[in-house]
Amino acid sequence: MSELTTLARPYAKAVFEVAQGAGDLARWSDQLGFMAAVVHDPTMKAFLDSPKLTREAAADTVIGVCEGRIDDQGKNFVRLLAENGRLTLLPEIAAIYEVMRAEAEGKVEALVVSAQPVSDAQKSAIAQSLAKRLGREVELVCEVDESLIGGAVIRAGDLVIDGSVRGRLERMAANLSR
């Protein structure tokens, strides 16, 4: 676990608990996603990293850019992060929050990396199979990586299924070298 994740987790957990208690998981998801995008922008990142910038000015700047996209609770959250020098953690906070939200809603995002594009029928079959195995609704994200040679690698949470030709070749090579 990276240091950023360790620092971001308590903030994500606190926001998640507030959002869940108020039944506002989707609203907070939107706000955190937007704030994270703002802070992740290279120009904004360089501005926020300036040693001459006060924490109050950093908060005011982020709030100003986010005006109309975040509510008063979102603004208070930005101020809290700024006071603690943690504004640049917003992308990690948003990512952790999304994992918590998906868990609470009984969903999981699965990444399918395949050597060739996955057809709609294959997507449906993969999603159904994973949903049965994981006991949750599965949202697929598909990517193509020709270096796999053939097959696919599926990642859903802690589960990794490597059915790629490259993976098989690497396992065979490892077994032969023993």
Curated annotation (Swiss-Prot):
Main location: membrane
One Pfam family hit: OSCP
InterPro entries given in the database record: ATP_synth_OSCP/delta_N_sf, ATPase_OSCP/d_CS, ATPase_OSCP/dsu
A molecular function (GO) term: proton-transporting ATP synthase activity, rotational mechanism
Alphabetized UniProt keyword annotations: ATP synthesis, Cell inner membrane, Cell membrane, CF(1), Hydrogen ion transport, Ion transport, Membrane, Transport
Secretion signal, residue range per the UniProt entry: none
GO cellular component terms attached to this protein's record: plasma membrane; proton-transporting ATP synthase complex
PANTHER family: ATP SYNTHASE DELTA CHAIN
Complexes and interactors: F-type ATPases have 2 components, F(1) - the catalytic core - and F(0) - the membrane proton channel. F(1) has five subunits: alpha(3), beta(3), gamma(1), delta(1), epsilon(1). F(0) has three main subunits: a(1), b(2) and c(10-14). The alpha and beta chains form an alternating ring which encloses part of the gamma chain. F(1) is attached to F(0) by a central stalk formed by the gamma and epsilon chains, while a peripheral stalk is formed by the delta and b chains.
Family note: Belongs to the ATPase delta chain family.
Name by which UniProt lists this protein: ATP synthase subunit delta
